[in-house]
Amino acid sequence: MKIKPLGDRVVIKMLESEETTKSGIVLPGSAKEKPQVAEIVAVGPGTVVDGKEVKMEVKVGDRVLTSKYSGTEVKFDGQEYTILKQGDILAIVE
């Protein structure tokens, strides 16, 4: 089974953030911010807004930066994913 997002939504898997600061301080789980770098695992077909087709600008495998608190977190087959709209993606990391 797999997740197939609808419209202009994408499914992402957050990538782990550093647990130690550059100066060597280890951060406890409660002090870490939600990671903002993710990998796209599924992409919806796009959508139509005001009669114009909105194409998807990202593809499976892209690494992206997301807004900190955007999307809906879901658990599927023992994995954690976030489903969000393409507009909540800030940039593609190359």
Swiss-Prot record:
PANTHER family: 10 KDA HEAT SHOCK PROTEIN, CO-CHAPERONIN GROES
Record protein name field: Co-chaperonin GroES
InterPro entries linked to this entry: Chaperonin_GroES, Chaperonin_GroES_sf, Chaprnonin_Cpn10_CS, GroES-like_sf
Keywords: Chaperone, Cytoplasm
Organism superkingdom: Bacteria
Family annotation (Pfam families): Cpn10 (PF00166)
Quaternary assembly: Heptamer of 7 subunits arranged in a ring. Interacts with the chaperonin GroEL.
Major location (coarse): cytoplasm
Family the entry assigns: Belongs to the GroES chaperonin family.
PROSITE patterns for the chain: CHAPERONINS_CPN10
Gene: groES
Function noted in UniProt: Together with the chaperonin GroEL, plays an essential role in assisting protein folding. The GroEL-GroES system forms a nano-cage that allows encapsulation of the non-native substrate proteins and provides a physical environment optimized to promote and accelerate protein folding. GroES binds to the apical surface of the GroEL ring, thereby capping the opening of the GroEL channel.
Localization, UniProt: Cytoplasm
Cellular component terms (Gene Ontology): cytoplasm
GO biological process, one term: chaperone cofactor-dependent protein refolding
HAMAP family membership: CH10
Molecular function (Gene Ontology), one example: protein folding chaperone
